[in-house]
């Protein structure tokens, strides 16, 4: 038997498993293949004049319909609040610049908002705060983003830290409803499975 044929048979067996004695068996291949928990990481780095910014964020989602917990530390940031967003791109060939990274991840075509808003971009994660030493300790829980293959899937997307704070779509201008007036990009990293 050739390797490709063996692989196809193996995948078909997994996707069609309906053994009633197994609690994880069933007709949903996403739940079967991704039983969770699922973990991911984004290695954050600045460029050019922001090259001193670095850190790492970990993502944990325990089940397909579960919340995603984001933890980590970023150093080298200017003191203050900074918008934190996931953009609809994974292409960093030109770095973190606006010409490379597209707009916020928004598969449902909604306006920009706060993480707690019922209608918002998938990629709207609000603000982080850097203290007077340039360190931001991040502990967030989000109910929208997903590490599982759904429309809110963030694996392979770019996580961006902005120059200024995100007004959460409440700035009263058209730009506020697009990007929260969060300014340019300080640092970024691609979200990848661990």
From Swiss-Prot:
Alphabetical list of PANTHER family matching this protein: SUPEROXIDE DISMUTASE CU-ZN -RELATED (PTHR10003)
CDD domains: Cu-Zn_Superoxide_Dismutase (cd00305)
Binding site for Cu cation: 85, 104, 162
Protein name: Superoxide dismutase [Cu-Zn]
The protein's assembly and partners: Homodimer.
Catalytic reaction annotation: 2 superoxide + 2 H(+) = H2O2 + O2
Function summary: Destroys radicals which are normally produced within the cells and which are toxic to biological systems.
